[in-house]
Amino acid sequence: MTLQEDIIRQLGVKAVIDPKQEIRQSVDFLKAYLLKHPFLKTYVLGISGGQDSSLAGKLAQMAIEELRAETGDEQYQFIAVRLPYGVQADEADAQKALAFIQPDQALTVNIKEAVDGQLRALETAGLEISDFNKGNIKARQRMISQYAIAGQTAGAVIGTDHAAENVMGFFTKFGDGGADILPLFRLTKRQGKALLKALKADPSLYEKVPTADLEDKKPGLADEVALGVSYQEIDDYLEGHTISAEAQARIEDWWHKGQHKRHLPITIFDDFWK
Protein backbone atom coordinates (compact mmCIF):
# COMPACT_ATOMS: atom_id res chain seq x y z
CA MET A 1 0.00 0.00 0.00
CA THR A 2 1.37 3.40 -0.95
CA LEU A 3 1.33 6.30 1.49
CA GLN A 4 -1.33 7.97 -0.65
CA GLU A 5 -3.56 4.90 -0.42
CA ASP A 6 -2.99 4.66 3.33
CA ILE A 7 -3.92 8.31 3.87
CA ILE A 8 -7.07 7.91 1.78
CA ARG A 9 -7.98 4.85 3.86
CA GLN A 10 -7.33 6.60 7.17
CA LEU A 11 -9.40 9.64 6.20
CA GLY A 12 -12.20 7.59 4.64
CA VAL A 13 -12.28 9.59 1.41
CA LYS A 14 -14.37 8.39 -1.52
CA ALA A 15 -13.27 9.18 -5.07
CA VAL A 16 -16.87 9.90 -6.08
CA ILE A 17 -19.77 10.91 -3.87
CA ASP A 18 -23.51 11.43 -4.06
CA PRO A 19 -23.98 14.77 -2.25
CA LYS A 20 -27.49 13.94 -1.08
CA GLN A 21 -26.34 10.64 0.40
CA GLU A 22 -23.46 12.37 2.19
CA ILE A 23 -25.81 15.00 3.58
CA ARG A 24 -28.07 12.27 4.93
CA GLN A 25 -25.11 10.37 6.41
CA SER A 26 -23.84 13.45 8.26
CA VAL A 27 -27.29 14.42 9.55
CA ASP A 28 -27.97 10.87 10.75
CA PHE A 29 -24.53 10.79 12.40
CA LEU A 30 -25.23 14.00 14.33
CA LYS A 31 -28.66 12.75 15.40
CA ALA A 32 -27.36 9.35 16.49
CA TYR A 33 -24.70 10.91 18.71
CA LEU A 34 -27.22 12.94 20.69
CA LEU A 35 -29.66 10.04 20.94
CA LYS A 36 -26.86 7.83 22.28
CA HIS A 37 -26.05 10.46 24.91
CA PRO A 38 -29.43 11.62 26.28
CA PHE A 39 -27.77 14.08 28.66
CA LEU A 40 -26.73 16.13 25.61
CA LYS A 41 -29.30 18.52 24.15
CA THR A 42 -27.43 21.05 22.03
CA TYR A 43 -24.81 21.39 19.37
CA VAL A 44 -22.50 24.42 19.43
CA LEU A 45 -20.51 25.67 16.44
CA GLY A 46 -18.51 28.79 15.65
CA ILE A 47 -19.62 30.44 12.40
CA SER A 48 -16.99 32.33 10.40
CA GLY A 49 -18.79 32.88 7.11
CA GLY A 50 -16.66 30.40 5.18
CA GLN A 51 -17.56 27.17 3.41
CA ASP A 52 -16.81 24.72 6.20
CA SER A 53 -18.71 26.33 9.08
CA SER A 54 -21.62 27.14 6.75
CA LEU A 55 -21.91 23.49 5.77
CA ALA A 56 -21.39 22.05 9.25
CA GLY A 57 -23.87 24.55 10.67
CA LYS A 58 -26.55 23.70 8.14
CA LEU A 59 -26.13 19.97 8.75
CA ALA A 60 -26.35 20.53 12.50
CA GLN A 61 -29.52 22.61 12.22
CA MET A 62 -31.10 19.95 10.00
CA ALA A 63 -30.21 17.25 12.51
CA ILE A 64 -31.62 19.21 15.44
CA GLU A 65 -34.86 20.01 13.63
CA GLU A 66 -35.35 16.35 12.76
CA LEU A 67 -34.66 15.32 16.36
CA ARG A 68 -37.26 17.75 17.68
CA ALA A 69 -39.82 16.50 15.18
CA GLU A 70 -39.09 12.84 15.90
CA THR A 71 -38.85 13.02 19.70
CA GLY A 72 -41.04 15.98 20.60
CA ASP A 73 -38.19 17.22 22.80
CA GLU A 74 -37.91 20.99 22.38
CA GLN A 75 -34.71 21.06 24.41
CA TYR A 76 -32.78 20.03 21.32
CA GLN A 77 -31.21 23.23 20.01
CA PHE A 78 -28.45 24.31 17.66
CA ILE A 79 -26.40 27.28 18.85
CA ALA A 80 -24.40 29.17 16.25
CA VAL A 81 -21.67 31.39 17.68
CA ARG A 82 -20.01 34.39 16.11
CA LEU A 83 -16.50 34.77 17.54
CA PRO A 84 -14.92 37.90 16.06
CA TYR A 85 -11.66 39.38 17.22
CA GLY A 86 -12.73 43.01 17.39
CA VAL A 87 -14.45 43.92 14.13
CA GLN A 88 -14.44 41.16 11.51
CA ALA A 89 -13.70 42.50 8.04
CA ASP A 90 -15.98 39.97 6.35
CA GLU A 91 -18.85 40.19 8.84
CA ALA A 92 -21.31 40.37 5.93
CA ASP A 93 -20.25 36.86 4.90
CA ALA A 94 -20.88 35.57 8.41
CA GLN A 95 -24.35 37.08 8.34
CA LYS A 96 -25.02 35.37 5.00
CA ALA A 97 -24.00 32.08 6.58
CA LEU A 98 -26.38 32.63 9.49
CA ALA A 99 -29.19 33.49 7.08
CA PHE A 100 -28.53 30.22 5.25
CA ILE A 101 -28.29 28.10 8.39
CA GLN A 102 -31.22 29.69 10.27
CA PRO A 103 -29.91 28.50 13.65
CA ASP A 104 -32.18 28.10 16.65
CA GLN A 105 -29.93 30.46 18.58
CA ALA A 106 -27.19 32.83 17.48
CA LEU A 107 -24.74 34.28 19.99
CA THR A 108 -21.83 36.68 19.55
CA VAL A 109 -18.78 36.47 21.79
CA ASN A 110 -16.05 38.96 20.97
CA ILE A 111 -12.74 37.31 21.85
CA LYS A 112 -10.58 40.44 21.57
CA GLU A 113 -10.55 41.35 25.27
CA ALA A 114 -9.71 37.79 26.33
CA VAL A 115 -6.96 37.37 23.72
CA ASP A 116 -5.41 40.76 24.42
CA GLY A 117 -5.52 40.09 28.16
CA GLN A 118 -3.67 36.82 27.65
CA LEU A 119 -1.05 38.58 25.53
CA ARG A 120 -0.52 41.23 28.21
CA ALA A 121 -0.09 38.54 30.86
CA LEU A 122 2.49 36.73 28.73
CA GLU A 123 4.34 39.96 27.99
CA THR A 124 4.39 40.77 31.71
CA ALA A 125 6.03 37.38 32.20
CA GLY A 126 8.73 38.44 29.77
CA LEU A 127 7.56 36.68 26.61
CA GLU A 128 7.21 38.40 23.27
CA ILE A 129 4.45 36.65 21.34
CA SER A 130 4.74 36.40 17.55
CA ASP A 131 1.84 37.29 15.28
CA PHE A 132 1.60 33.64 14.22
CA ASN A 133 1.43 32.49 17.85
CA LYS A 134 -1.19 35.14 18.57
CA GLY A 135 -3.26 33.64 15.75
CA ASN A 136 -3.19 30.28 17.50
CA ILE A 137 -4.21 31.95 20.76
CA LYS A 138 -7.24 33.37 18.93
CA ALA A 139 -8.18 29.91 17.66
CA ARG A 140 -7.89 28.42 21.15
CA GLN A 141 -9.85 31.25 22.75
CA ARG A 142 -12.68 30.59 20.31
CA MET A 143 -12.83 27.00 21.50
CA ILE A 144 -12.77 28.10 25.15
CA SER A 145 -15.87 30.16 24.42
CA GLN A 146 -17.63 27.36 22.54
CA TYR A 147 -16.95 24.85 25.30
CA ALA A 148 -18.18 27.33 27.91
CA ILE A 149 -21.44 27.64 25.98
CA ALA A 150 -21.68 23.88 25.54
CA GLY A 151 -21.02 23.39 29.25
CA GLN A 152 -23.94 25.67 30.15
CA THR A 153 -26.35 24.16 27.63
CA ALA A 154 -25.69 20.41 27.91
CA GLY A 155 -24.01 20.57 24.55
CA ALA A 156 -21.33 19.10 22.33
CA VAL A 157 -19.01 21.19 20.17
CA ILE A 158 -18.95 20.60 16.43
CA GLY A 159 -15.69 20.89 14.51
CA THR A 160 -15.31 21.72 10.83
CA ASP A 161 -12.27 19.57 10.07
CA HIS A 162 -12.47 17.77 6.72
CA ALA A 163 -10.11 15.53 4.78
CA ALA A 164 -8.32 18.31 2.90
CA GLU A 165 -7.51 20.18 6.12
CA ASN A 166 -6.73 17.02 8.03
CA VAL A 167 -4.16 15.68 5.60
CA MET A 168 -2.33 19.00 5.78
CA GLY A 169 -2.64 19.36 9.56
CA PHE A 170 -4.17 22.75 8.78
CA PHE A 171 -5.77 23.46 12.12
CA THR A 172 -4.65 24.72 15.50
CA LYS A 173 -3.90 22.01 18.02
CA PHE A 174 -6.44 22.35 20.85
CA GLY A 175 -7.93 25.24 18.90
CA ASP A 176 -10.24 24.57 15.98
CA GLY A 177 -8.83 21.03 16.08
CA GLY A 178 -10.35 20.53 19.53
CA ALA A 179 -13.98 19.51 19.07
CA ASP A 180 -16.33 16.69 20.06
CA ILE A 181 -17.70 15.64 16.70
CA LEU A 182 -16.70 16.13 13.05
CA PRO A 183 -19.56 15.79 10.55
CA LEU A 184 -17.37 16.78 7.56
CA PHE A 185 -14.59 14.27 8.20
CA ARG A 186 -14.10 12.15 5.04
CA LEU A 187 -14.99 14.96 2.61
CA THR A 188 -12.56 16.82 0.37
CA LYS A 189 -12.91 20.56 -0.12
CA ARG A 190 -14.65 20.17 -3.48
CA GLN A 191 -16.98 17.55 -2.06
CA GLY A 192 -18.00 19.94 0.71
CA LYS A 193 -18.75 22.50 -1.98
CA ALA A 194 -20.93 19.93 -3.75
CA LEU A 195 -22.94 19.41 -0.56
CA LEU A 196 -23.52 23.15 -0.19
CA LYS A 197 -24.68 23.32 -3.80
CA ALA A 198 -27.11 20.46 -3.14
CA LEU A 199 -28.38 22.40 -0.12
CA LYS A 200 -28.92 25.44 -2.38
CA ALA A 201 -26.52 27.67 -0.49
CA ASP A 202 -25.66 31.12 -1.82
CA PRO A 203 -22.63 30.60 -4.12
CA SER A 204 -20.72 33.26 -2.16
CA LEU A 205 -20.51 30.81 0.76
CA TYR A 206 -18.50 28.26 -1.22
CA GLU A 207 -16.80 30.44 -3.82
CA LYS A 208 -15.09 32.61 -1.20
CA VAL A 209 -11.30 32.21 -1.03
CA PRO A 210 -10.64 29.94 1.98
CA THR A 211 -8.67 31.63 4.77
CA ALA A 212 -8.02 30.94 8.44
CA ASP A 213 -7.57 34.72 8.88
CA LEU A 214 -5.72 34.41 12.17
CA GLU A 215 -2.70 36.65 11.65
CA ASP A 216 -3.02 40.41 12.15
CA LYS A 217 -0.06 41.12 9.87
CA LYS A 218 -1.41 38.86 7.11
CA PRO A 219 -5.16 39.50 7.15
CA GLY A 220 -7.15 37.20 4.91
CA LEU A 221 -4.10 35.09 4.03
CA ALA A 222 -5.37 32.43 1.64
CA ASP A 223 -5.06 28.83 2.83
CA GLU A 224 -3.44 27.82 -0.45
CA VAL A 225 -0.74 30.47 -0.04
CA ALA A 226 -0.03 29.34 3.52
CA LEU A 227 0.13 25.69 2.47
CA GLY A 228 2.05 26.13 -0.76
CA VAL A 229 -0.32 23.80 -2.61
CA SER A 230 -3.81 24.24 -4.06
CA TYR A 231 -6.99 22.63 -2.79
CA GLN A 232 -7.46 21.19 -6.26
CA GLU A 233 -4.16 19.34 -5.89
CA ILE A 234 -5.01 18.24 -2.34
CA ASP A 235 -8.45 17.01 -3.40
CA ASP A 236 -7.05 15.22 -6.44
CA TYR A 237 -4.52 13.48 -4.20
CA LEU A 238 -7.18 12.43 -1.70
CA GLU A 239 -9.49 11.19 -4.44
CA GLY A 240 -6.75 8.90 -5.72
CA HIS A 241 -5.56 10.83 -8.75
CA THR A 242 -1.97 11.36 -9.88
CA ILE A 243 -0.62 14.84 -9.21
CA SER A 244 2.77 16.44 -9.72
CA ALA A 245 5.65 14.94 -7.77
CA GLU A 246 6.30 18.32 -6.16
CA ALA A 247 2.71 18.70 -4.93
CA GLN A 248 2.60 15.11 -3.70
CA ALA A 249 5.83 15.55 -1.77
CA ARG A 250 4.52 18.72 -0.14
CA ILE A 251 1.23 17.11 0.87
CA GLU A 252 2.98 14.06 2.32
CA ASP A 253 5.47 16.26 4.17
CA TRP A 254 2.58 18.16 5.78
CA TRP A 255 0.96 14.82 6.65
CA HIS A 256 4.05 13.65 8.52
CA LYS A 257 4.59 16.99 10.27
CA GLY A 258 0.99 17.12 11.44
CA GLN A 259 0.76 13.60 12.85
CA HIS A 260 0.97 14.84 16.45
CA LYS A 261 -2.20 16.88 15.86
CA ARG A 262 -4.19 13.76 15.01
CA HIS A 263 -3.46 12.03 18.31
CA LEU A 264 -4.44 12.55 21.90
CA PRO A 265 -1.50 13.54 24.13
CA ILE A 266 1.37 11.14 23.49
CA THR A 267 1.87 8.31 25.98
CA ILE A 268 4.80 5.96 26.50
CA PHE A 269 2.92 3.36 24.45
CA ASP A 270 2.68 5.51 21.29
CA ASP A 271 5.21 4.95 18.55
CA PHE A 272 3.81 6.89 15.57
CA TRP A 273 6.26 9.72 16.26
CA LYS A 274 9.41 7.60 16.25
Curated annotation (Swiss-Prot):
Highest taxon listed in the record's lineage: Bacteria
Gene Ontology molecular function terms on file: ATP binding; glutaminase activity; metal ion binding; NAD+ synthase (glutamine-hydrolyzing) activity; NAD+ synthase activity
Residue numbers binding ATP: G46, I47, S48, G49, G50, Q51, D52, S53, T160, K189, T211
CDD domains in UniProt: NAD_synthase
One GO term describing the cellular component: cytoplasm
Residues that, per the record, bind deamido-NAD(+): R140, K173, D180, H260, K261
Catalyzed reaction equations: deamido-NAD(+) + NH4(+) + ATP = AMP + diphosphate + NAD(+) + H(+)
Residues that hold Mg(2+) according to the record: D52, E165
Keyword Protein biosynthesis: no
Keywords assigned by UniProt, alphabetized: ATP-binding, Ligase, Magnesium, Metal-binding, NAD, Nucleotide-binding
Gene Ontology BP term (one): NAD biosynthetic process
Pathway assigned to this chain's UniProt record: Cofactor biosynthesis; NAD(+) biosynthesis; NAD(+) from deamido-NAD(+) (ammonia route): step 1/1
Listed EC numbers: 6.3.1.5
InterPro entries in UniProt: NAD/GMP_synthase (IPR022310), NAD_synthase (IPR003694), NH(3)-dep_NAD(+)_synth (IPR022926), Rossmann-like_a/b/a_fold (IPR014729)
Keyword Acetylation carried by entry: no
Enzyme class: ligase
Pfam assignment, any one: NAD_synthase
PANTHER family with a match to the protein in the record: NH 3 /GLUTAMINE-DEPENDENT NAD + SYNTHETASE, NH(3)-DEPENDENT NAD(+) SYNTHETASE
Family of this protein: Belongs to the NAD synthetase family.
Alphabetical list of HAMAP family matching this protein: NadE_ammonia_dep (MF_00193)
Function (record text): Catalyzes the ATP-dependent amidation of deamido-NAD to form NAD. Uses ammonia as a nitrogen source.
Assembly information from the UniProt record: Homodimer.
Descriptive protein name: NH(3)-dependent NAD(+) synthetase
Species of origin: Streptococcus equi subsp. zooepidemicus (strain H70)
